[in-house]
C-alpha cells in the first residue's frame, strides 16, 4: 500500500466503485474519482451504457459492479494515491518510459508530478531520450553500413552478366576503392595530385602578373597544365562510366556529377573560342564562359572522393537539415531585430556609416557570427550597448545547434572510417554457399556397396552372407588388396 491510501476511508453510506487492476482490488468512493473528471476513472463514472464502459476498461462485472483493467498493479498504487492526495509521485526503480505510458493511459498529465519527484523525473527522461537517440543513431549507422556493403556485393555480382565483366570489375574496384591494392592507391594519389595542381594553376592564373587591360593572359605553361588536368579528368570520368555496372546509378552518385561539372567550363570555353564570327550572341556567350571559368573552383569538391572528412561533412549536413534550418532561423530573427535597433540609434549620426537598414543587416550578420570586419561600426553609446548585446546573443545562438551537429559529424566520421576499413580487403567479397546436406548412413552404405561390387569384379563372392565370420572378411580384404596391387603393377 502507498501511504496516501490511508488518508481516506470511505464511509458505510457512501457509494463505492470497485476496481480490479491486474488482480489488485480496491474500493474507492465516487467523490474521490470525480475530483479529476478528465482522467480515465473520472470519465468512467459518467458512462450511461455498458458499451461506453467497455471502451474505458477491459471488462465489467454487472453483478459485482467491478471494473477490471489489465494494467500493472504496482503502478496503479501510485495512480490511486494521486486521486487521494492530488499529487503524483514517481517510483525510484521504475522505467521512465513505462511510467510515462502508464499515466498517459490513466489520463493523468505530467504536470501533476510533485516537486520532490519532478526534477528527477525530467532528468531521467532526458537521459533516456539521449540514450535512445544514440542507440537509434548506432542502429542506423550499422544498418546503413550493412546495406552499403550489401550494395557493394550486388554491384560486383552484376559484372558476371556484363560483357568483359571480369575486366570491368577489376577496373571498377580499383577506381572506386583506393585501399584495395597498390595500383588503386597509385591511381588515387595521382588523381589527388592532379586536382591540387589544377586548383593551384587556377589560383596562379588570377595573379596580377598574368593580367592585362583586356583580361587574363594565356600563359603556355599554365595552359599546358590546364589541358593536362582536363585530359586526366575526362579520361578518369570516361573510364568510370565505361566500367560502371549500371549507367543509371552512376549518374545518381553526387561525386560523379561533380566530376562532370568540373570539366564543363573548359569544353564550353573551347566551343565558344572556335567561333570566328562576331555577333551580340557570341559576345553574350563570352560573358557566360567567363562565369563558367569561375566554376572551375568546383574541382576542389573532387577532393571528397579521397577525403573521409569531406564525405562525413556532406552526410552530416544532409542529415542535419533541421538543426541547420534552426540555426539559420535564430540568426535571421536576431539579425532582423538588431539591425532595426542599431538603425534607430545611429541614423542621425553623421559619423556613423549605419545609414540604412540593409547596411545594418550586413553589420548585424558579421556581428552575430562574431566575424567583425570593422568596416561598419556604431559610434554612439546606445549603439555600442546594442552591439555588445548582439555579439553575446550571436555566440549563444550559434553555440546551441552546433553541439548537435558536431555529435552527428563524429558519428558519421566514425561510420565512414569503419566502411573504408571494411573495403580494404585484398579480395572482393565472395558468396557464402550453403553447406551440402548428406546422411552419414547413406555414405557408409554407398562405400560398403562399392566394396562388395569390387570384390565381385575380381571373383571374390560370399556365398552365404550369414555364415561370414571375421576371418573370412579379413581374407577377402587381403585378397582385394592383393588384386588391387597387381592391377596397379600391371598398369
Curated annotation (Swiss-Prot):
Gene Ontology CC terms: membrane; voltage-gated potassium channel complex
UniProt topological domain (Cytoplasmic) ranges: 1-182, 244-254, 307-321, 414-491
UniProt keyword terms in alphabetical order: Cell membrane, Ion channel, Ion transport, Membrane, Potassium, Potassium channel, Potassium transport, Transmembrane, Transmembrane helix, Transport, Voltage-gated channel
Compartment(s) where it occurs, according to its Swiss-Prot or TrEMBL record: Cell membrane
Protein origin, superkingdom: Eukaryota
One Pfam family matching this protein: Ion_trans
GO biological process, one term: potassium ion transmembrane transport
Ranges of the Extracellular topological domain: 205-220, 276-285, 344-357, 378-384
Summary of subunit composition and partner proteins: Heterotetramer with KCNB1. Does not form homomultimers.
Description of its domains: The transmembrane segment S4 functions as a voltage-sensor and is characterized by a series of positively charged amino acids at every third position. Channel opening and closing is effected by a conformation change that affects the position and orientation of the voltage-sensor paddle formed by S3 and S4 within the membrane. A transmembrane electric field that is positive inside would push the positively charged S4 segment outwards, thereby opening the pore, while a field that is negative inside would pull the S4 segment inwards and close the pore.
PANTHER family (UniProt xref): POTASSIUM VOLTAGE-GATED CHANNEL SUBFAMILY S MEMBER 3, VOLTAGE-GATED POTASSIUM CHANNEL
Purpose of the protein: Potassium channel regulatory subunit that modulates the delayed rectifier potassium channel activity of KCNB1 by namely slowing down the deactivation and inactivation time constants. While it does not form functional channel on its own, it can form functional heterotetrameric channels with KCNB1.
Protein name: Delayed-rectifier potassium channel regulatory subunit KCNS3
